[in-house]
């Protein structure tokens, strides 16, 4: 009986810790009011979830979930990290001539553009991690040379979707 109580308390503690962890503001909140109505009116929103309008298979032909999971956990990959730091050149974004068109790629999907004097920032991730657990999914050396202090006023901010490697809460708040 004592053992079962300990197991129950451990499970309860894990549930509470996970719940509290998920209450952090960087996880967002459920849509309500006008925003929820706008979502419900989207042509992509059906049966309570967003769906692609075109057929978009989650797994390629000839594969199944078991083989994908097996490969993820037990397969060998030599492509996970570059052998050396990525070469990078830091552009002084604060001193760009307004008439100069510029594209600066920061890595993955993050980039800055200046076109006809307007500034655009796409999928900014400058906190050094693309995960709510900072010790996982860290930036590659060489792709982390910019901070939010390096940017001029941004005219347009684009977030392509709400994955951690495209939408960095700490960067957006800065």
Task: Outline where the language-model segments fall.
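Metallo-beta-lactamase
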Residues: 2-137
């Amino acid at each position: 009986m004592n053992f079962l109580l300990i197991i129950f308390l451990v499970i309860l503690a894990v549930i509470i810790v996970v719940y509290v962890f998920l209450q952090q503001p960087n996880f967002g909140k459920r849509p309500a009011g006008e925003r929820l109505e706008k979502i419900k009116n989207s042509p992509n929103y059906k049966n309570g979830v967003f769906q692609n309008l075109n057929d978009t298979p989650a797994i390629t032909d000839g594969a199944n979930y078991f083989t994908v999971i097996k490969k993820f956990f037990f397969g060998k990959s030599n492509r996970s990290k570059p052998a050396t730091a990525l070469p990078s050149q830091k552009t002084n974004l604060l001193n760009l001539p307004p008439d100069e068109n510029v594209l600066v790629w920061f890595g993955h999907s993050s980039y800055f553009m200046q076109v006809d004097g307007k500034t655009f920032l796409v999928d900014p991730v400058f906190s050094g991690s693309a995960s709510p657990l900072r010790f996982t999914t860290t930036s590659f050396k060489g792709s982390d040379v910019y901070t939010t202090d390096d940017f001029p006023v941004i005219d347009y901010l684009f977030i392509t979707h709400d994955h951690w490697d495209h939408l960095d809460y700490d960067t957006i708040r800065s």
